[in-house]
Amino acid sequence: MGSGCRIECIFFSEFHPTLGPKITYQVPEDFISRELFDTVQVYIITKPELQNKLITVTAMEKKLIGCPVCIEHKKYSRNALLFNLGFVCDAQAKTCALEPIVKKLAGYLTTLELESSFVSMEESKQKLVPIMTILLEELNASGRCTLPIDESNTIHLKVIEQRPDPPVAQEYDVPVFTKDKEDFFNSQWDLTTQQILPYIDGFRHIQKISAEADVELNLVRIAIQNLLYYGVVTLVSILQYSNVYCPTPKVQDLVDDKSLQEACLSYVTKQGHKRASLRDVFQLYCSLSPGTTVRDLIGRHPQQLQHVDERKLIQFGLMKNLIRRLQKYPVRVTREEQSHPARLYTGCHSYDEICCKTGMSYHELDERLENDPNIIICWK
């Protein structure tokens, strides 16, 4: 498990009929001081309105995560059993990934109590100490844990690392598989995703995939967004031979990183050709500059492109952030016309977006804007 959510302590707290809220067990022992527990106990053994809810509280440079449980029955002292099995982490730790584990453990202990009085009987409750020890060690070591409770009950737990939200997939974005397409099995995806997978080739944009797969555009965007979240695809811009690119500082990684070199040369070499040389590929990337189109690059470097697929060259460069695209954004300098597509000429909408929204080709849009004295083109 990542160090960002390392568990420092696991505790079991309960409400004692005469002593009130107390820590019954903790692993390691004496980790939670009396002072810390006194500070947070109202969030560990809580009032009814906070019971069965995930609670995270930070105090004294520690973050405690718990899910207070209350089981009401006349067999218990004061007609209720109150307990909480929780985790303690550093105050700065990102603990979102641990919350489902805490919630699940609360549910398991509730079920075990209802079925066999596991928590309320002293003999079985003592089994919590070795269980908590295994939990602490295995979750910290591997992010997963299998807990045999008794002959008929086993608990399986796994920490699911939180992924950052991916960029929003737009109709003019081009999805590209991050690994070999054959590595992904169609059957593991929903029907919409299965329908569009054959059309993801690294060159079709989302709107084109929607049209050719005969799937509603918004459904395609949702499916691509899901693939993005799981890292199955990444997004690049539409490839046109009139496009302009320039290298980023990361292009230097191609010289320093052997594994990146291997991946790049395998990716960009033309099928059936002798393997491309690193020298040629690096020179091609460094030859990209403002004012140089892909068409210009092909005309100026026929020798270097003998074994290099220029489309794959651009695609790989974008995927690995070795290069970036300079896009054209039309800006209308007067406010006279607000018709479609003139309202898109604000400097906030790229050629890719405008062409997708209007159905115009790049050439048609270029001609239209070149003949309009009130339009200027901003490159960014």
Swiss-Prot record:
Q: Which domain of life is it from?
A: Eukaryota
Record-level Gene Ontology MF annotations = GTPase activator activity
Origin organism lineage? Eukaryota, Metazoa, Chordata, Craniata, Vertebrata
Glycyl lysine isopeptide (Lys-Gly) (interchain with G-Cter in ubiquitin) crosslink location in chain: 158, 357
Residues that hold GDP according to the record: 78
**This protein's name:** GATOR1 complex protein NPRL2
- Is Ubl conjugation set as a keyword in this record? yes
- In this chain's numbering, which residues are marked as the site (Arginine finger)? 124
Q: Where is this region: Interaction with PDPK1?
A: 1-133
One GO location term (cellular component): lysosomal membrane
UniProt modification remark: In the presence of abundant amino acids, ubiquitinated at Lys-158 and Lys-357 via 'Lys-6'-linked ubiquitination by the WDR24 component of the GATOR2 complex, thereby inhibiting the GATOR1 complex and promoting mTORC1 activation. Asymmetric dimethylation at Arg-78 by PRMT1 inhibits the GTPase activator activity of the GATOR1 complex and consequently inducing timely mTORC1 activation under methionine-sufficient conditions.
**How are the domains described in the entry?**
The arginine finger is critical for the GTPase-activating mechanism.
Q: Which disease is it linked to?
A: Inactivating mutations and truncating deletions in the genes encoding GATOR1 proteins, including NPRL2, are detected in glioblastoma and ovarian tumors and are associated with loss of heterozygosity events. Inactivation of GATOR1 proteins promotes constitutive localization of mTORC1 to the lysosomal membrane and blocks mTORC1 inactivation following amino acid withdrawal. Epilepsy, familial focal, with variable foci 2: An autosomal dominant form of epilepsy characterized by focal seizures arising from different cortical regions, including the temporal, frontal, parietal, and occipital lobes. Seizure types commonly include temporal lobe epilepsy, frontal lobe epilepsy, and nocturnal frontal lobe epilepsy. Some patients may have intellectual disability or autism spectrum disorders. Seizure onset usually occurs in the first or second decades, although later onset has been reported, and there is phenotypic variability within families.
Expressed, tissue-wise, as follows: Most abundant in skeletal muscle, followed by brain, liver and pancreas, with lower amounts in lung, kidney, placenta and heart. Expressed in the frontal lobe cortex as well as in the temporal, parietal, and occipital lobes. Expressed in most lung cancer cell lines tested.
Its annotated compartments are: Lysosome membrane
- State how changing residue 295 to A affects the protein, per the record: Does not affect the GTPase activating protein activity of the GATOR1 complex
Q: What is the effect of changing residue 368 to A?
A: Does not affect the GTPase activating protein activity of the GATOR1 complex
Homology family = Belongs to the NPR2 family.
Which organism is this entry from?
A: Homo sapiens (Human)
Tell me where the transmembrane regions lie.
none
Keywords noted in UniProt:
Disease variant, Epilepsy, GTPase activation, Isopeptide bond, Lysosome, Membrane, Methylation, Tumor suppressor, Ubl conjugation
